[in-house]
Amino acid sequence: MQDKIVIHGARAHNLKNIDVEIPRDKLVVVTGLSGSGKSSLAFDTLYAEGQRRYVESLSAYARQFLGNMEKPDVDSIDGLSPAISIDQKTTSKNPRSTVGTVTEINDYLRLLYARVGTPYCVNGHGAITASSVEQIVDQVLELPERQRLQILAPVIRKKKGQHKTVFDKIQKDGYVRVRVDGEIYDVTEVPDLSKSKQHDIEVVVDRIVIKEGVRSRLFDSVEAALRIAEGYVVIDTMDGKELLFSEHYACPVCGFTVPELEPRLFSFNAPFGSCPDCDGLGVKLEVDLDLVVPDSSMTLREGALVPWNPISSNYYPQMLEQAMTSFGIDMDKPFEELSEEEKQLIFFGSDGREFHFHYENEFGGVRDIDIPFEGVVTNINRRYHETNSDYTRTQMRTYMNELSCVACHGYRLSPQALSVRVGGEAGLHIGEISDLSIADHLLQLDKLSLTDNEATIARPILKEIHDRLTFLNNVGLNYLTLSRSAGTLSGGESQRIRLATQIGSNLSGVLYILDEPSIGLHQRDNDRLIASLKKMRDLGNTLIVVEHDEDTMREADWLIDVGPGAGVFGGEIVAAGTPAQVAKNKKSITGQYLSGKREIPVPLERRVGNGRFIEITGAAENNLQNITARFPLGKFIAVTGVSGSGKSTLVNSILKKTLAQRLNRNSDKPGKFKTISGVDYIDRLIDIDQSPIGRTPRSNPATYTGVFDDIRDLFAQTNEAKIRGYKKGRFSFNVKGGRCEACSGDGIIKIEMHFLPDVYVPCEVCHGRRYNSETLEVHYKEKNISQILDMTVNDAVDFFKHIPKINRKLQTIKDVGLGYVTLGQPATTLSGGEAQRMKLASELHKRSTGKSLYILDEPTTGLHTEDISRLLKVLDRFVDDGNTVLVIEHNLDVIKTADHIIDLGPEGGVGGGTIIATGTPEEVAANEASYTGHYLKGKLK
């Protein structure tokens, strides 16, 4: 086999016909500026071709189900292995996907509980066991010889009634005696039973003495008793002791039954085991009373019931006032002072009691009717489930929240599944063990109390679970729980989960391609991640990692720097070699940062802010330990801490959602906290994340930033446009008029191919220019509208230098380092980092109030150190204008430039959730308890 992968003539996206050699069975890091072509080389060339060759090897019949992959634009690739991509874009948003299902640990847990689990009565009557006739007989024969026994069939247990038909059937079946409520009677002489009392009725099947040769008779009698009592038998030893047996998993005291233990019983994705109330989701969509009455100090007349406020109709306000008058409820009393009975009536209705409703609409229509009062909660639920209107359903949804299912307490499983425990009655059920952190889960497995027989059965299952948990622990995910919904994971977390799964597969000879696995990982955990990558390499695999993390680059066997710039200024191999060789390459920007010739400087002084702050007290959502956090305003704030320490919970779930409620009227419910102060010092909340700026190719930088509106205005003002009567809309490719109708303004036509990938070809009518020929005849400075869209931002800045309104917006795009992007580049082709910087550019050209709060969650994702340097300059501009910038970040180059740090920890999960250190980077670095401070020391020298 070849010792290297050889690529000739790669031209995907901005790659400039490059040739590159990649050593096999090595840890190879591909780096470079955002937009330089790293992903084009790793994913769109290497992975795409590896996948395509595999799919091509299958039959045409199989290919129609798998889909066909487009051949990447490359001349040849030699030495290619089967490729597996582990990126951040394939996180499951299915609410049924959890960490346990994605890693397949749940499959082994289900098997463990099915094989060595013991069900326990939910009513506290102890273990529930199932016994065969043979097992019952063997156990009875262990009693002392000459022991006298009664074999009873319990046909009625704790049921009210006279039960005459039961006695008739017993007599008809040929049995002579019965035991009723502990007393033996002849079946024909049973006294009349009280209808209102509970009774126990047992058929006396046989009376025997334990002695040699009795086994056959005992077997027949036990079998008969089980048949009569539908699986139950009582062995009365005649000296006050009774033995209860069942051939089913059923409690002999209360009758609680459990089906035969099998893996599907413990699956919340199967009807057999899922909670019947929430269908295995663990949550139910319920009306949230806090959203219905957000301010309980208001009266009903003042509008305490938000859903029934008179926005478009007076129907509900009129009905409310007349109903309250009828039922004697004061409309002018603060809602919080109403009695519980009054609140229940307002929320859930009058329980059939009617009131007279006289309604007059704005058109003069009158309605007189006696009706029960429905209640606002009942009304919202009914309208949400019965309406055919998307608008109404959306409106009703704003007053609802996903609340933990009351029936299963959020565990997703049926009572029968949750009754099964491993390790005795003190052990945990499968829901409880799934709620443990990975680290605690490992400890729990190590101290399981099993019998010798159970240990033998469980050993291979426990090994698989233990190995997978250890892999998760080793990639820095020790704080996660198996019950954590996959949709709530960050891109970095989901990628490391799949990485752990691949390590567990022990494959060799595979080409793994990873996209920034260090995202969201604290420096403390980076060493463990790198060790995991090296372990995969040592199994005989080739790892190609797109990465900007300095530690990962230094630990690589081979480093490829793509550049020198981004977009049209990138797409070349600037340097390739060992990290030491790249560090010596003067052309490589990456090399200059590795060698220390370039660096992001530590600020000479820290900002003092404006003296005001936002303070949150009693923050207790997820793992937060009832903390108080102060965010000083007018500063650059970094919230830091190990993965899972509570950073996102504090900033995103509590601070951001609370401010969004107060400032933007958002209905998302914040996490748990007691009070928040200082909100009045903020007038705008701007969340700048890395989500796409548009979900269709029609969205582009020009449309997103609003500069395209100005450009279309400019074209509409040209003499040619005025002569032809063209308005601004003529120059839009989204509406009929000026666009090419052959391609609907897309510029390309999709041709569907049978058994081959769809082919996209330039439109034959407009030749990819999006507009019809008449529109393209209008020029501004010898350029038509299509040629403007093909310009890079750098070129457009010069072209429109005398049009301040346009130039200012374009300059902000250039300032954030996106000068290489074309104005018409489809938004779907922008990376997450590029999309985030485009949002920053859009904010930059808006007029600043000096009272804005910008929140960025890990803004360095996908960014090279050079990109981070530019990003920091932009963020500094926001703060210098008097605004506040708050980032959640692990990157030490960003943290060291902050004015104020809030460090959470000390660990992740239940071991975190407290504030370890606050202050300037220098103050945090001096704090011995802070992991962040420990790593920060080296950056502040």
Residue spans of the language-model regions?
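Conserved phosphate-binding elements of NTP-dependent enzyme cores
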Residues: M1-K941
